[in-house]
Amino acid sequence: TVLMDELAKTLELAKKLFPSIKEVSVETDPQIMGDPQIHMLEGLVDRMSIGVQSFDDGILKMTERDKFGTGQEVFENIAKAQELFPICNVDMIFGFRGQTDEILQRDLETLLKLSPRQITTYPLMVTSQTKRSVKDSIAAPHDVMAGQYRMILDMLTKEYTQLSSWAFGKSNNEGFDEYVIDNDEYLGVGSGAFSFLGDSLYVNTFSLRRYNERIGSGNNGVERRKVFGKRSILQYRLLLQLFAGRISRKYFKDVHGVDLDRALFKEVLALKLAGAIKENPEDHDRFIVTDKGKLLGLVMMKDFYSAMDNIRAELRKPLKEADM
């Protein structure tokens, strides 16, 4: 449940305390777009992202998201409210068991009819915390995903520009909420937030009680830290650039002080041999990321985010009721 007035006050306070804030992105469920109070966020939110997953009633029921309304109701709620925000993004998921090509095609046709400013098509992500029986009941076989991704590219790129392996926008200079791509460092604020600064990943405590105690005593909320070596950081940035569809030799030279082809010789060679990237005859600095590369980037980021979800689940596991 979203307390719209409290969210509006929080955003107003954040902008007052941090005048340098340029964009505010908010995630929500479909039924919130049908709430009359959604107008309170007009002018405060630059990008509204709605987790739809599918417009198919069968899939919505299977994933227990029919509580947010039927596919038609979801469509109507978004259609009414999307003009309130400069950017409206619709999150979809593919790779469900029982999601036939016909169902996916109807979803994509519905998306094109809705015509949001941005579309994100995530592959189904199932973490190690999910029971095997549940995985088997909702996840399609792995060989299905490549064909579905091909359909997504063929249909969406007719009207949208591809921004990353799974993001599409009306223009090629869209702002989209994959801050890890464009920022080597980022700071997370709040309980359970992640930060990457220097060579370290920091995780704030997931206990609201401990977080409040730490902040109240003048400390930060960090509970875990993981230090990464130079090579691991370079591999991480190569993954993100593959996912973004733009691998730049100049970036690695200017930011990390290395020759990409030498520092990650095996990785670059493997990507070339796999047909994921190829030399750009018009720009030696940038590789061309092929459709195979986009699919590879999508699969690798899927596994990366699933691993992050596993970390969250492990850190939440010991929490007691008093921590919530």
What residue ranges belong to the model's regions?
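Short amphipathic alpha-helical interaction segments
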Residues: 258-273
